[in-house]
Swiss-Prot record:
Assembly notes: Component of the U4/U6-U5 tri-snRNP complex composed of the U4, U6 and U5 snRNAs and at least PRP3, PRP4, PRP6, PRP8, PRP18, PRP31, PRP38, SNU13, SNU23, SNU66, SNU114, SPP381, SMB1, SMD1, SMD2, SMD3, SMX2, SMX3, LSM2, LSM3, LSM4, LSM5, LSM6, LSM7, LSM8, BRR2 and DIB1. Interacts with the pre-mRNA-splicing helicase BRR2 and the ubiquitin-like modifier HUB1.
Start and end residues of each stretch annotated as Disordered: 403-423, 471-526, 547-587
UniProt key word Cell membrane: no
Phosphoserine sites (modified residues): S268
Major place of residence: nucleus
Cell compartments where the protein resides: Nucleus
Name of the protein in question: 66 kDa U4/U6.U5 small nuclear ribonucleoprotein component
Organism from which the protein derives: Saccharomyces cerevisiae (strain ATCC 204508 / S288c) (Baker's yeast)
Stretches with biased composition (Basic and acidic residues): 478-501
Role noted for this protein: Component of the U4/U6.U5 tri-snRNP particle, one of the building blocks of the spliceosome. Required for pre-mRNA splicing.
Listed Polar residues bias regions: 504-515
Length: 587
């Protein structure tokens, strides 16, 4: 069984104090006349009757305990204050070699490690003030902080929050800590930015001519900072106004002369700031005595070139296809043609027309096709009774005087006699279309309607539909080959390199043609391939390639597909009509 011990409040408070806990407060009972006060024995009797725990008897119950709670709280606060002071006083830079270390510095913790007591009581006694200590001893650990404002600048009505001023961590100098109002500092910086921006705007709009550079502005800002730091408050152990240090200006060395140049005139482009004055270079005016007259170069006079028509020598082109060059430009130098020249030109035109008609007649006699020229005379040779006659019938009509007119009625050709130019009887005896005037043929309405009518009457023989297109391709290839093999004659000058290139081209072309002909020596378009399986059954191209791919990849079809293919092969065996499709013709 565990034993239970009852402790009094005083004992409990002693234990709690050793553990650093808050003691239990003890309240004294006030003696009231109108209420009965029971002793501990009477209270225990009542608690025993109620089944409650008895109160142990206590000695000196009314005596007040010592004020231990207040002393422990003060000690804790002092410890915290000393810790914060040590952190604030710790230097941010490393100590130099020849610099003496302070006892409170963090750099001297190795030297003073044995001197600092390790026990909690000795530490508390060292931090707590002594009874006989003076005010100077108490203010040793307090830290002096400077304020960047005077007493007049700080308004007593408004609360101001001061924070440490930002400083660079790379600054090796012993910079003192300064408190400032963040809002006021930001307002001053914004006000300065607005002022500089307005100055820049005025400079661009040429309202002001500023002889101020960015270096001058930086010097002005440094001067303002120096003036602020010279007169500021001190908060800490010694409160008051710090006086400006008396700095002795360095005397210039004797025996030397110092020359100060004008900074505005001798300022380089790199050192010049945003507000550098604009410099406009004056235009250099040359001496009129030294100027030389510019000589104008006159071009050579253009000679008149006589134009030579090279096409006049090509007489064979004039016979086959005369070319008429129309020059719309009229020149005053052209002389007026006389009547003899005009008569000569008219006679020449008549001769050309006569020669043309004779050539057309010769073409009609030689060929069996219709020759269409620019005249309408060939339309008179057409007969409207073509449907009543056969497509290959030719009639010979004899004139009363004995002269013959031979006409090919099917193709619409006529041959005129030497005596009289009379039309054939077939043309004169035109049938009358009185019933349907709309369906009557009209050869003079256009060439398209005439050709359409001739197609309807089966005058034109159309090509066979059953002919293979391969023959046309072969014909076109033969024509191309003939054209390629023709030797083109022409006049021109070639260099040695060009001639060598042409010879190589012709030799390569002939070699390619020979190789192409050799490849096609064994070509036979009538060969037919027959595919058979291992059992000798005929297969189509698709089935044969499918079997080859399955054999190559090592796969096979399922039972359903194999049965379907087998039934298809059996059905093909039973049909004797397809025998000629898969075998060679014996004939």
């Amino acid at each position: 069984m565990n034993k239970t011990e009852n402790l009094s409040i005083e004992e409990t408070n002693e234990i709690r104090e050793k553990l650093g806990m808050k003691p239990i407060p003890v309240f004294q009972e006030k003696n009231t006349d109108h209420k009965e006060s029971l002793s501990i024995e009477e209270t225990n009797e009542l608690r025993a009757s109620l089944g409650l725990k008895l109160i142990p008897p206590q000695q000196n119950f009314n005596s007040s305990p010592p004020n231990v709670h207040n002393t422990s709280k003060i000690d804790e606060l002092r410890e915290k204050i000393t810790k914060f002071q040590k952190k604030a006083n710790a230097p941010l830079r490393m100590a130099h070699l020849l610099e003496e270390t302070n006892v409170n510095d963090d750099s001297s913790w190795l030297e003073n490690m044995d001197a600092i007591p390790s026990s909690h009581e000795s530490k508390r006694s060292s931090t707590l003030p002594r009874k006989g200590a003076t005010k100077e001893d108490e203010n040793i650990d307090l830290h002096n902080v400077q304020v960047s404002y005077n007493i007049e600048a700080l308004s007593p009505k408004k609360d101001t929050i001061l924070t440490l001023k930002e400083s660079s961590i790379f600054d090796d100098t012993d910079s003192t800590e300064v408190l400032e109002n963040v809002k006021a500092a930001e307002e001053n910086a914004d006000r300065e930015k607005l002022r500089l921006r307005q100055m820049n705007k005025d400079r661009r709009q040429k309202k002001k001519i500023l002889n101020v550079s960015s270096l001058d502005i930086e010097e002005e800002e440094e001067g303002e900072k120096h003036s602020i730091t010279t007169t500021h408050l001190i908060i800490g152990a010694e409160q008051g106004v710090m006086k400006a240090p008396n700095t002795i200006s360095a005397k210039p060395p004797t025996g030397k002369v110092k020359v100060n140049f004008d900074s505005a005139n001798n300022m380089s482009d790199e050192d010049g700031g945003d507000f550098k004055p604009l410099k406009i270079k004056k235009r250099k005016i040359k001496d009129p005595r030294s100027t030389k007259a510019r000589k104008s170069k006159i071009t050579d006079k253009m000679e008149i070139v006589k134009l030579v028509d090279e096409d006049e020598s090509l007489s064979w082109m004039e016979e086959e296809q005369p070319v008429t060059i129309i020059n719309p430009r009229t020149s005053s130098n052209n002389e007026l043609k006389g009547p003899e020249d005009l008569a000569r030109e008219i006679e020449k035109a008549r001769d050309e027309e006569k020669r043309r008609t004779e050539s057309i007649l010769k073409m009609r006699e030689i060929s069996n096709s219709i020759v269409v020229d620019e005249k309408v005379t060939f339309l008179n040779t057409l007969d409207t009774s073509l449907s009543e006659r056969s497509a290959t019938e030719n009639k010979v009509k004899v004139h009363g005087e004995g002269e013959k007119n031979i006409g090919d009625v099917t193709n619409g050709h006529t041959k005129e006699g030497s005596g009289n130019n009379t039309l054939t009887e077939a043309v004169n005896n035109e049938p009358n279309y009185e019933g349907d005037a709309e369906n009557a043929p009209n050869f003079f309405s256009g060439l398209a309607s005439t050709l359409g009518y001739l197609r309807k009457k089966s005058v034109f023989t159309t090509g066979d539909v059953d002919l293979k297109p391969g023959k046309d391709v072969n014909n076109s290839e033969s024509l191309r080959r003939d054209v390629r093999n023709k030797e083109h004659t022409g006049t021109g000058t070639y260099t040695k390199d060009k001639l060598h290139g042409l010879e190589q081209f012709t030799s390569s072309d002939s070699s390619n043609a020979n190789t192409h002909s050799k490849r096609q020596d064994h070509y036979d378009p009538d060969i037919k391939l027959v595919y058979r399986d291992e059992k000798g059954n005929r297969l189509t191209t698709k089935e044969a390639y499918k079997k080859l791919s399955q054999k190559f990849h090592g796969t096979k079809s399922n039972k359903k597909k194999r049965a379907k293919m087998k039934s298809r092969i059996e059905a093909r065996k039973n049909t004797p009509e397809n025998g000629s499709l898969f075998e060679f013709d014996d004939n």
